[in-house]
């Protein structure tokens, strides 16, 4: 699977069960009518209960140069330190939106399908916030790669 390049995303939530976030590349568009994304989340992950109970999330697609933030959200760093490392806005669902992301998709989880060790979260997009940073970041062959031309 390391040969499948993918955008790097930080998935965030905030709600009754608290604030949490993790790095994910297993994210993709499902349909534009209605606008829907999917996010894959391991049920064994420490953040799984928070996302499962809050039922909202924001997909923050990272820009070139945000590798350190991706690594921070992909590790065992306490949540308060993860969120303190960047500037955030609050989206319409109450989820944190990364100010310097390429784009943020504010979503409600509309359906969950379990496959093996993971849940596939189908996410109905409530709002989209495009940022001014034009260069994307992808994960390919177990390393980061900056897109050298504007992504959008």
Swiss-Prot record:
Homology family: Belongs to the non-flavoprotein flavin reductase family. RutF subfamily.
SUPFAM superfamilies referenced in this protein's UniProt entry, alphabetically: FMN-binding split barrel
InterPro entries in the record: Flavin_Rdtase-like_dom, NADH-dep_flavin_reductase, RutF, Split_barrel_FMN-bd
Name of encoding gene: rutF
SMART domains given in the database record: Flavin_Reduct
Induction annotation: Up-regulated by the nitrogen regulatory protein C (NtrC also called GlnG) and repressed by RutR.
EC number: 1.5.1.42
Protein name: FMN reductase (NADH) RutF
Keyword entries, A-Z: Flavoprotein, FMN, NAD, Oxidoreductase
Annotated GO MF terms: FMN binding; FMN reductase (NADH) activity; FMN reductase [NAD(P)H] activity; riboflavin reductase (NADPH) activity
GO biological process: nitrogen utilization; uracil catabolic process
Species name: Shigella sonnei (strain Ss046)
Class in the EC hierarchy, top level: oxidoreductase
Catalytic activity of the protein: FMNH2 + NAD(+) = FMN + NADH + 2 H(+)
Nucleus recorded as keyword: no
Function: Catalyzes the reduction of FMN to FMNH2 which is used to reduce pyrimidine by RutA via the Rut pathway.
Native organism taxonomy: Bacteria, Pseudomonadati, Pseudomonadota, Gammaproteobacteria, Enterobacterales
């Amino acid at each position: 699977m390391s040969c499948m390049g993918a955008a790097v995303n930080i998935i965030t939530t905030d709600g009754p069960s608290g604030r949490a976030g993790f790095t994910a590349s297993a994210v993709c568009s499902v349909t534009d009518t209605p606008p829907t994304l999917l996010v894959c989340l391991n049920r064994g992950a420490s953040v799984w209960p928070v996302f499962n109970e809050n039922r909202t999330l924001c997909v923050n697609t990272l820009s070139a140069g945000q590798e350190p933030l991706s690594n921070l959200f992909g590790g065992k760093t306490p949540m308060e330190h993860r969120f303190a490392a960047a500037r955030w806005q609050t989206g319409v669902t109450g989820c944190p939106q990364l100010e310097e992301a390429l784009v943020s998709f504010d979503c409600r989880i509309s359906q969950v399908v379990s496959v093996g060790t993971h849940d596939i979260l189908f996410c109905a997009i409530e709002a989209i916030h495009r940022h001014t940073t034009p260069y994307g970041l992808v994960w390919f062959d177990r390393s980061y790669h900056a897109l050298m031309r504007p992504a959008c």
